[in-house]
């Protein structure tokens, strides 16, 4: 490990001397792109992060928002584990789950749900399938073992991820105000206590590793930078954390993630504008002869750092012992520098704020992305429908989510496969449901980063609206390639601006998130990928699902769209086009339609456009007969719109302030019949299911 020349000069100026080897390694990791957001920090001010519901916004391990009408607080956070999941898809993905769950614990919350947004290279690529298989197994094994359901997410395939997949995981938790904890250290003299797994050498330099392009030999050369998870210890840590909170033993908390103990402990005291004195020899270790740098920076999993009052240390140790967890009193909070001692010598002595917040921002050159030309194909209607329904990006994700236990915890009331997940808030005792949507479409942002990111916000809000829910807050995972490339950084800038404007348009604060850059490899950079996780709520009003009842008229709330840019239609059949302008006004209209008593089914427009939305609504017992004005109207993926089956189309049209277009009617024959101009194509439910079963068919 080594600091760059300019950073080393800054460190020498701050310390008044050359750094020790341990200090240099600590600064390199904490000042890395992964930890310090050096290339993106200046862009993040574009996001609005305040609302009446926000209790804790950006800067902590997870954000906290209040659920209106209840005494419950919801925590939400999102993290990336991209590079590790390429090197070791199973452990990389599993430890990504573990890390975001511990972020939830750090706030005093109990984790109730996970969502995963996964991005891989072309589905036809054998290595992409290998990565998909390993990532899903890792998430499944870890999430199932700790008893937290994975209830929402998305899986996307795009050639930009061939050499660098993305694994973005969000977690939602519950807490009440009296149990809320933050990471900021509070009082000099309090003890710092490390609870959980013993520290080994795994994950060394993980933060630095995540701040570089993936090399061609990364799967072997970078294996030591990938952590190894133990979900059974994580489950014990979850329950121990609850017990510590029950007994009011926690003053502040932070999980050990990027940069390990050095990152967690220095950030805790920096947030409290305090210092610390830490004895590294006191850390419980599982490997012999570890040196100071290894103890400081190892990213061994399932560990928490707590600030504890001196009088409560024995009680904390007793709780750890009860749950068969290691426990070390490693130091105390001070008013001075952040100091670490090892083998009787001082190996780190630096201001905590310089370590945690002193990395200078990097000004990156950028070029403005250019809009694509319009060059649309003109296939036969049947050819187009079959091609789009058979595409991996419109395929059923059942193969993925059936591996997850989405029922554990007895809260799940809207399951994977619907527009958004729904989780019963039993504590509110009034039927309130927490809703969750997560994901992004790289085809949209590869086409036009600003418009595609804006649409990502509208799409996730529409998912909630189709479930009758109103958004409370969002967290983002901003994934990009090498920021030193002006074209890449220009796309990243446009993506951030578009997502910020889109979240403003849906009136949803962005309360936290994660930036992951240097997602670049020998095959090139990824598409700018703005994963968004939106948490919302719904009162006791029931809403229908997406399956047709076969007993109503079909209308399109939000009207037809024309642009085909970023669509599966163009991916499957060739051509280019501009991305359609999403209208956030449709979100409220979809929500109103979903909660009406005369609504029988509702499903939003997304991947594959109107054609796929209708196909997904068809069941063996209910079908649809519709007329659409053209191929663009059938396949445009412009969000903020939904198909609604209603008993009273006239009343619905009169009630909404957005265009409502009559499409046709639901039937009881289990077939989809689509007419465009003078051409009609019919596909039955079995054929649709076969088309959309490509992932399961190829991987089972």
Swiss-Prot record:
Its EC number is 6.3.5.3. Pathway: Purine metabolism; IMP biosynthesis via de novo pathway; 5-amino-1-(5-phospho-D-ribosyl)imidazole from N(2)-formyl-N(1)-(5-phospho-D-ribosyl)glycinamide: step 1/2. It comes from the Archaea. It is found in: Cytoplasm. It holds the Pfam family AIRS_C. ATP binds at residues 37, 476, 513. Mg(2+) 2 binds at residues 103, 255. GO terms for cellular component: cytoplasm. It catalyses: N(2)-formyl-N(1)-(5-phospho-beta-D-ribosyl)glycinamide + L-glutamine + ATP + H2O = 2-formamido-N(1)-(5-O-phospho-beta-D-ribosyl)acetamidine + L-glutamate + ADP + phosphate + H(+). Signal peptide: none annotated. Mg(2+) 1 binds at residues 79, 514. The active site is at residues 34, 81. Part of the phosphoribosylformylglycinamidine synthase complex involved in the purines biosynthetic pathway. Catalyzes the ATP-dependent conversion of formylglycinamide ribonucleotide (FGAR) and glutamine to yield formylglycinamidine ribonucleotide (FGAM) and glutamate. The FGAM synthase complex is composed of three subunits. PurQ produces an ammonia molecule by converting glutamine to glutamate. PurL transfers the ammonia molecule to FGAR to form FGAM in an ATP-dependent manner. Belongs to the FGAMS family. Monomer. Part of the FGAM synthase complex composed of 1 PurL, 1 PurQ and 2 PurS subunits. This is Phosphoribosylformylglycinamidine synthase subunit PurL. It comes from Halobacterium salinarum (strain ATCC 700922 / JCM 11081 / NRC-1).
């Amino acid at each position: 490990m080594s600091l760059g020349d300019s950073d080393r000069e800054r460190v020498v100026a701050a310390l008044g001397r050359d750094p020790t080897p341990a200090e240099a390694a600590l600064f390199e990791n904490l000042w890395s792109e992964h930890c310090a957001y050096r290339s993106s920090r200046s862009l993040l001010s574009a996001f609005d992060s305040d609302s009446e519901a926000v209790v804790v916004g950006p800067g902590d391990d997870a954000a906290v928002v209040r659920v209106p009408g209840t005494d419950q607080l919801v925590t939400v956070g999102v993290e990336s584990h991209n590079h590790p999941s390429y090197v070791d898809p199973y452990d990389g993905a599993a430890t990504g789950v573990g890390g975001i769950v511990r972020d939830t614990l750090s706030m005093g919350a109990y984790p109730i749900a996970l969502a995963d947004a996964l991005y891989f290279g072309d589905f036809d690529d054998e290595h992409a399938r290998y990565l998909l298989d390993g990532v899903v197994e890792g998430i499944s094994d870890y999430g199932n073992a700790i008893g937290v359901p994975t209830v929402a997410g998305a899986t996307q395939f795009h050639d930009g991820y061939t050499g660098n997949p993305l694994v973005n995981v969000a977690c939602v938790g519950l807490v009440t105000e009296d149990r809320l904890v933050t990471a900021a250290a509070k009082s000099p003299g309090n003890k710092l206590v490390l609870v959980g797994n013993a520290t080994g050498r795994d994950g060394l330099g993980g933060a630095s590793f995540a701040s570089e392009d993936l090399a061609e030999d990364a799967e072997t050369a970078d294996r030591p930078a990938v952590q190894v998870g133990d979900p059974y210890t994580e489950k014990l840590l979850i329950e121990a954390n609850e017990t510590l909170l029950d007994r009011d033993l926690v003053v502040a908390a932070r999980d050990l993630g990027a940069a390990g103990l050095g990152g967690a402990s220095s950030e805790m005291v920096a947030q409290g504008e305090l210092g610390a004195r830490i004895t590294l020899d006191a850390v419980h270790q599982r490997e012999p002869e570890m040196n100071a740098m290894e103890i400081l920076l190892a990213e061994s999993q399932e560990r928490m750092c707590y600030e504890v009052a001196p009088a409560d240390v024995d009680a904390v140790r007793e709780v750890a012992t009860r749950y068969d967890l290691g426990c070390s009193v490693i130091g105390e909070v001070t008013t001075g520098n952040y100091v670490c001692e090892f083998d009787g010598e001082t190996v780190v002595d630096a201001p905590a704020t310089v370590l945690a917040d002193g990395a200078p921002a990097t000004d990156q050159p950028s070029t403005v992305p250019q809009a694509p030309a319009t060059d649309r194909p003109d296939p036969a209607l049947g050819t187009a429908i079959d091609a789009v329904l058979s595409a991996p990006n419109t395929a059923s994700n059942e193969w993925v989510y059936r591996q997850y236990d989405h029922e554990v915890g007895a809260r799940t009331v809207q399951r994977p496969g619907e527009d958004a997940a729904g989780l019963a808030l039993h504590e509110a005792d009034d039927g309130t449901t927490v809703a969750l949507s997560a994901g992004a479409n790289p085809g949209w942002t590869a086409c036009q980063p600003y418009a595609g990111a804006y649409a990502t916000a509208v799409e996730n809000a529409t998912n909630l609206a189709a479930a009758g829910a109103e958004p409370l807050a969002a967290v983002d995972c901003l994934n990009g390639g090498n920021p030193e490339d002006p074209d890449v950084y220009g796309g990243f800038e446009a993506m951030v601006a578009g997502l910020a404007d889109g979240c403003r348009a849906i009136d949803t604060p962005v309360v936290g998130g994660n930036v992951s850059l240097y997602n670049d490899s020998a095959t090139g950079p990824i598409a700018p990928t703005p994963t968004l996780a939106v948490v919302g709520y719904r009162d006791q009003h029931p809403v229908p699902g997406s399956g047709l009842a076969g007993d109503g008229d079909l209308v399109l709330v939000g009207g037809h769209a024309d642009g085909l840019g970023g669509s599966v239609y163009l991916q499957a059949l060739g051509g280019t086009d501009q991305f359609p302008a999403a209208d956030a006004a449709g979100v409220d209209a979809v929500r109103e339609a979903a909660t009406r008593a005369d609504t029988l089914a509702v499903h939003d427009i997304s991947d594959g456009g109107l054609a796929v939305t209708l196909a997904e609504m068809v069941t063996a017992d209910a079908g649809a007969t519709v007329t659409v004005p053209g191929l663009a109207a059938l396949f445009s993926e412009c969000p903020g719109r939904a198909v609604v089956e209603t008993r009273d189309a006239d009343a619905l049209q009169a009630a909404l302030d957005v265009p409502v277009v009559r499409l046709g009617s639901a039937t009881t024959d289990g077939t989809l019949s689509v007419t465009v101009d003078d051409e009609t194509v019919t596909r039955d439910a079995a054929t649709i299911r076969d088309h959309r079963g490509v992932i399961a068919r190829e991987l089972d």
